[in-house]
């Protein structure tokens, strides 16, 4: 699957809008009661479990008293989000779709164990709040500001996709305007983070994880009850472009030399994705902040390793996608519904709303909504912590007698970042609205391609015994971002939105084909080499 630039014809757009109205009528008042009840229950329970918030350690690290299994469940809930819930089934449902996305799980597991047994002991040498504190201690304040800026940029880009995904769910089942959905999502995420910091975030994540699994299992049971698994397997054998295709195929050994733009291959999974996942779980504060909530290296290591079971959730949602494809081959949708299914991202929420019993459909969709919020409240806590660390430093944050003042300030910063993230979601919707065939999974991973490589490069510079210069790291970061911008489709879209259609068309015409995943190791190497080369000139030395 590639994230390409497509435009819906006006007729398709009108048909899609008509479909939204038809679908949301199936969402009954019982569903609304279930959704409202679940959200109220989760909010109240999260508040009750938040504990005391007397200082910054309580707010951002949960007092370092959280059990490892809750931290692991929170990591899985954050990783999954609504992106997996509707993006993965939609990806399989597409006529050319299959299970090859599952191969990426190998790279994910390799990276988690590498983080658990190599990186966590380094982080626990000192009392720190983020990997950026670790890098700042070793490379200086300039490096800390660089990686914090990269993290903030990558978070806004990546999480805005998750805001968009959740808005799609709400739009399909409620008929509300997508922009209003985005504002509601942002407001709930701010509220949950504001209430109790990481304690609330982690415990609500555990609840979301349980409901998310329940929703996926229930959907699969209902599909298999209607169609046997053998029938689902048979119906997933199709002909695409005159060739037979098994939509349950999950292995692909095509090399990047044969098809450089192909992303779901074993070579990408084993070579490129370990770098992406090592950065995601070892450098991205969205996930690493959970490790710091554990009371010991042993607990943090267990939390990280056991989070590998998330691959089973991916298998579950791939199976749901195959089931949905078979379902609609047997139960052909109306022309209006079929028109909206050209955007595979609408398939699962539409099926839930129309085919699942009232009340149960509300519960499943509440789980999808809450799973999305669990990712967003996590990133708000992470952005707040890293921002305060840069502007105040750990000494001021931990100063005796200023604990409650810092907690109040943290909550204000959470609100500010919440508004920024909501605005980014609105901006992304403006782009997606005219390109609704985009592969959301590819879009999410493509967004982090801008920053993950440089982040990993700076971490390597902090760990390796070499001379580096922060200015070189900045140069490498700029080169990396420019390189990704050349290969990715977002820049032409932005230029087109600004009215620079000539430039956009020219850039699209001359854009090379290469899967975004290869930029994780490539840009890490570029950033590290630039820092090392400038450091070798003797302009600066690593402390």
Annotated model-derived regions:
Residues 17-543:
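Membrane-embedded helix-loop-helix hairpins and adjacent transmembrane boundary segments
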């Amino acid at each position: 699957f590639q994230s390409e630039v497509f435009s819906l014809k006006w007729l398709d757009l009108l048909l899609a809008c008509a479909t939204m109205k038809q679908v949301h009528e199936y969402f009954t008042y019982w569903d609304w009661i279930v959704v409202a009840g679940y959200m109220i229950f989760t909010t109240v329970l999260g508040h009750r479990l938040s504990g005391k918030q007397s200082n910054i350690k309580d707010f951002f690290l949960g007092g370092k008293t959280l059990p490892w299994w809750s931290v692991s469940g929170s990591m899985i809930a954050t990783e999954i989000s609504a992106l997996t819930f509707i993006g993965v089934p939609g990806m399989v449902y597409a006529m050319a779709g299959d299970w090859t996305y599952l191969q990426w799980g190998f790279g994910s597991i390799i990276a988690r164990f590498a983080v658990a047994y190599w990186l966590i002991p380094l982080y626990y040498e000192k009392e720190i709040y983020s990997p950026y504190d670790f890098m700042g201690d070793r490379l200086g304040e300039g490096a800390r500001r660089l990686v914090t800026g990269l993290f903030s940029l990558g978070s806004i880009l990546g999480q805005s996709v998750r805001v968009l995904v959740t808005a799609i769910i709400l739009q399909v089942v409620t008929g509300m305007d997508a922009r209003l959905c985005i504002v509601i999502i942002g407001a709930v995420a701010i509220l949950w983070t504001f209430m109790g910091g990481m304690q609330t975030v982690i415990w609500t994540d555990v609840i979301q994880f349980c409901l998310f699994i329940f929703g996926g299992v229930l959907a699969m049971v209902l599909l298999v009850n209607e169609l046997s698994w053998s029938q689902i397997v048979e119906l997933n054998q199709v002909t695409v472009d005159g060739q037979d295709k098994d939509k349950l195929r999950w292995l692909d050994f095509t090399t990047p030399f044969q098809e450089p733009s192909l992303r779901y291959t074993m070579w990408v999974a084993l070579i490129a994705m370990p770098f992406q996942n090592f950065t995601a779980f070892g450098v991205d504060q969205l996930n690493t902040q959970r490790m710091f909530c554990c009371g010991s290296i042993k607990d943090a290591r267990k939390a990280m390793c056991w989070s590998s079971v998330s691959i089973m959730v991916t298998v579950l949602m791939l199976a749901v996608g195959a089931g949905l494809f078979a379902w609609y081959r047997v139960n052909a949708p109306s022309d209006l519904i079929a028109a909206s299914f050209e955007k595979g991202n609408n398939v699962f929420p539409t099926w839930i709303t129309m085919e699942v019993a009232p009340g149960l459909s509300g519960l499943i969709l509440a789980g999808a909504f809450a799973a999305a919020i669990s990712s967003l409240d996590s990133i708000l806590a992470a952005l707040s912590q890293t921002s305060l660390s840069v502007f105040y430093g750990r000494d001021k944050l931990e100063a005796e007698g200023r604990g409650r003042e810092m907690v109040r300030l943290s909550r204000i910063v959470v609100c500010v970042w919440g508004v920024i993230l909501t605005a980014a979601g609105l901006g992304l919707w403006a782009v997606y609205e005219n390109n609704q065939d985009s592969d959301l999974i590819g879009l999410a991973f493509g967004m982090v391609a801008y920053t993950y490589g440089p982040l990993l490069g700076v971490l390597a510079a902090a760990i390796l015994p070499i001379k580096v210069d922060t200015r070189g790291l900045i140069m490498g970061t700029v080169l990396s971002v420019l390189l990704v911008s050349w290969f990715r489709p977002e820049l032409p879209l932005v230029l087109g939105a600004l009215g620079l259609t000539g430039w956009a068309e020219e850039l699209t015409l001359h854009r090379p084909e290469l899967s975004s995943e290869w930029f994780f190791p490539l840009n890490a190497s570029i950033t590290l080499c630039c820092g090392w080369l400038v450091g070798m000139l003797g302009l600066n030395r690593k402390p």
